[in-house]
Amino acid sequence: MSETDSTFHEMREPQLEKVVVHMAVGEGGRELANAEEILQEIAGQTAVRTTATRAASQFGAREGDPIGAKVTLRGADAQSFLEKALPLVTISERQFDETGNFSFGVEEHTTFPSQEYDPQIGIYGLDVTVNLTRPGYRVTKRDKASQPIPSRHRLTPSDAVQFIESEFTVDITRVSADTRDGGDN
C-alpha cells in the first residue's frame, strides 16, 4: 500500500455543495426582469426574486421591495457553471473564508461566451458564491441530534484551494507572507 493510499479517505474528500449566482439591481420593474432573463440564460435555471429585508432610504428601497434575483445550482449544474465562470475571473487565496467557501464577482455579464451586448438591456454584473463541504456535514443541519463538525474534519482554506485547482484546472493566486500581514512594502 502506498503512502498516498494510507492518507486518502473518501469522507475527507471535499465536494461542491452549491453555487449561488446573484444579481442585485436595486429596484423592480424592467431592470429586474432583464436581470432575471440574463440569469436564466447564463445559469440555465429559473431565477428567484430577492427582496429587501429592511428599508434602506439611501437606495430608495422599502422592506419587501424586489431588489434582485438569484439562482442556486447544485450537482452537475453547479459543476458546469463553474467550468464556464472560473476561467473568466482571477481568484485569490484571500477570497476563501475559514471554512473553505469563496465568492467572486463578474463585472459584466457579456464576458460569458453565450452573452452578447444588447443596448436595450445594458450591462449587468453578478456575484457568485461557492459553498464547499465534506461528506458528513449534514449532522450540523439535521433537526434531530445535530452536532458540530470536529475541527479535524472541517474544510480549511488550503484544502479548498487545492480542490478547486485540481477539479477545475484554474490557478489561484497565492498571497505572499508580506502582503498577508497587511504590509505592501
UniProtKB/Swiss-Prot annotation:
<dbReference type="GO" id="GO:0005840">
    <property type="term" value="C:ribosome"/>
</dbReference>
<comment type="subunit">
    <text>Part of the 50S ribosomal subunit; contacts the 5S rRNA and probably tRNA. Forms a bridge to the 30S subunit in the 70S ribosome.</text>
</comment>
<dbReference type="InterPro" id="IPR002132">
    <property type="entry name" value="Ribosomal_uL5"/>
</dbReference>
<keyword id="KW-0694">RNA-binding</keyword>
<dbReference type="Pfam" id="PF00673">
    <property type="entry name" value="Ribosomal_L5_C"/>
</dbReference>
<dbReference type="GO" id="GO:0000049">
    <property type="term" value="F:tRNA binding"/>
</dbReference>
<dbReference type="InterPro" id="IPR022803">
    <property type="entry name" value="Ribosomal_uL5_dom_sf"/>
</dbReference>
<protein>
    <recommendedName>
        <fullName>Large ribosomal subunit protein uL5</fullName>
    </recommendedName>
</protein>
<comment type="function">
    <text>This is one of the proteins that bind and probably mediate the attachment of the 5S RNA into the large ribosomal subunit, where it forms part of the central protuberance. In the 70S ribosome it contacts protein S13 of the 30S subunit (bridge B1b), connecting the 2 subunits; this bridge is implicated in subunit movement. May contact the P site tRNA; the 5S rRNA and some of its associated proteins might help stabilize positioning of ribosome-bound tRNAs.</text>
</comment>
<keyword id="KW-0820">tRNA-binding</keyword>
<dbReference type="GO" id="GO:1990904">
    <property type="term" value="C:ribonucleoprotein complex"/>
</dbReference>
<comment type="similarity">
    <text>Belongs to the universal ribosomal protein uL5 family.</text>
</comment>
<keyword id="KW-0687">Ribonucleoprotein</keyword>
<keyword id="KW-0699">rRNA-binding</keyword>
<dbReference type="InterPro" id="IPR031309">
    <property type="entry name" value="Ribosomal_uL5_C"/>
</dbReference>
<dbReference type="InterPro" id="IPR031310">
    <property type="entry name" value="Ribosomal_uL5_N"/>
</dbReference>
<dbReference type="GO" id="GO:0003735">
    <property type="term" value="F:structural constituent of ribosome"/>
</dbReference>
<keyword id="KW-0689">Ribosomal protein</keyword>
<dbReference type="Pfam" id="PF00281">
    <property type="entry name" value="Ribosomal_L5"/>
</dbReference>
<dbReference type="GO" id="GO:0019843">
    <property type="term" value="F:rRNA binding"/>
</dbReference>
<dbReference type="GO" id="GO:0006412">
    <property type="term" value="P:translation"/>
</dbReference>
<dbReference type="InterPro" id="IPR022804">
    <property type="entry name" value="Ribosomal_uL5_arc"/>
</dbReference>
